[in-house]
């Protein structure tokens, strides 16, 4: 990881909370304490800027720039949202999905059950993982992240929009424990490329709700566009 910063960082707090600003050695120690092989460039930059704001008592007395670059390995993330239109395609779809390298994320209760059946395991709901806004997550052995479907994806979109609008939002997002936040972090800070497999099956219970099939497809297309804007290579397939 390479960290470059302007004098606004080293001068942070001068005459306010410190006598001579934020000492270079202290900055280096801060970076080392907050570094891990998985911490994103945006998270590191936001952490440094947050400390500058604290030292300046939120006044930001000097122009401050932080640039962080990180060399990392490729990390594909494969996301299945909804089961295929025909149950006859379940087996081939699962083989396609799990045949891809990288992490595997499953969104939706029906999808989770189909995946668990294919893997020969059970779906376990994670107690306490839900909020008023986001349904609880589940756990499937062999799957990296399992969330509820369209409601979670809808909130994930909001999280991604907030992330792209405000570079400091990563610090808030990192402390959220719901499925939408975890999904947003995986897509934004872990994935180098995203493969979305969108199931064409209709959910009759949602036909007359705000989450009709057409709306779900539109939502997933918006997710693709937002991730592309975030610099991800995104491929979307409909099954």
Roles of regions detected by a PLM:
Residues 2-51, 204-207:
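Active-site-proximal, acidic helix/loop segment immediately C-terminal to a metal-coordinating Asp/Glu
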Residues 49, 53, 184-185:
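Generic structural signal for well-ordered alpha-helical scaffold segments
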Residues 54-59:
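Short proline/glycine-enriched turn/loop segments at secondary-structure junctions
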Residues 60-61, 190:
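A short, structural micro-pattern
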Residues 62-66:
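Short hydrophobic/aromatic beta-strand or adjacent loop that forms the aromatic wall/cage
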Residues 67-72:
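Short hydrophobic alpha-helical segments used for membrane anchoring or interfacial signaling
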Residues 73-103, 112, 116-239:
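Non-transmembrane, aqueous-exposed alpha-helical and coiled segments at domain scale
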């Amino acid at each position: 990881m390479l960290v470059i910063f302007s004098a606004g960082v080293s001068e942070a707090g001068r005459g306010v909370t410190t006598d001579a600003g934020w000492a270079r050695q202290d900055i280096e120690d801060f970076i080392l304490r907050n570094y891990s092989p998985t911490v994103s460039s945006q998270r590191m930059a936001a952490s440094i800027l947050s400390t500058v704001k604290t030292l300046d008592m939120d006044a930001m007395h000097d122009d401050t720039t932080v640039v962080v670059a990180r060399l990392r390995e490729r990390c594909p993330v494969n996301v299945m949202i909804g089961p295929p239109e025909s149950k006859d395609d379940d087996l081939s779809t699962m083989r396609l999905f799990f045949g891809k390298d990288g992490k595997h994320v499953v969104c939706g209760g029906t999808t989770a059950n189909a995946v668990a059946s294919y893997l020969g395991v059970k779906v376990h709901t994670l107690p306490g993982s839900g909020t008023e806004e986001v349904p609880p997550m589940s756990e499937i052995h062999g799957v990296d992240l399992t969330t509820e479907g369209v409601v979670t994806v809808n909130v994930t979109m909001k999280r991604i929009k907030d992330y792209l609008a405000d570079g400091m939002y990563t610090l808030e997002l990192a402390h959220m424990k719901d499925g939408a936040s975890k999904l947003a972090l995986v897509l934004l800070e872990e994935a180098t490329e995203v493969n979305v497999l969108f199931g064409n099956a209709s959910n009759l219970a949602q036909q007359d709700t705000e989450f009709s099939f057409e709306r779900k497809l539109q939502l997933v297309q918006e997710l693709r566009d937002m991730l592309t804007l975030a610099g991800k290579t995104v491929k979307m397939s409909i099954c």
